[in-house]
Amino acid sequence: MKLILKENIEHLGQIGDIVKVAPGYARNYLLPKGLAIEATEKNAKALEHAKRQLAYKKNKSLEAAKNLVAKLEALSIVLTHQAGEEGKLFGSVTNMEIAAFLKDNGLEIDRKKIVLAEPIKQLGEYSVPVKVHPEVGATLKVTVSAA
């Protein structure tokens, strides 16, 4: 089934792309959530008009992402946890905890965009990548210290 994407969808395409997907995926997920519309002639003509608006929207979201990256990279994250004598944490620091810290500091970031290969289980300083935008990423400096 051919669809025109209304939102960026990871592993599928960008806004305005015409993609071919399984009918069930289209009927049960993309169409009901408003993430895509059917690729008919009428919608294709509307797409041409919408592409100009989409270009503006992409530029605006890219600028917002760059501003967010500047704020993120200026921020120093210090998390305190109980730790054993060898610096091993009781528990771990996850992307959820980092997202909660950012939210407390006025930056709303989805935890899925914070890329941790595995939870942090030792004291120390870490660089944590964040997927802010498909074209722009940031690196957070996370320091885990003993409580």
UniProtKB/Swiss-Prot annotation:
The organism sits in which domain of life?
Bacteria
- Any one cellular component term from GO for this entry? ribonucleoprotein complex
Q: Does the keyword Magnesium apply?
A: no
**Keywords attached to this entry:** Ribonucleoprotein, Ribosomal protein, RNA-binding, rRNA-binding
Q: Name one Pfam family in it.
A: Ribosomal_L9_N
Which PROSITE patterns did the record assign? RIBOSOMAL_L9
Q: Which PANTHER family does the entry link to? A: 50S RIBOSOMAL PROTEIN L9
Q: What does this protein do?
A: Binds to the 23S rRNA.
Record-given protein name: Large ribosomal subunit protein bL9
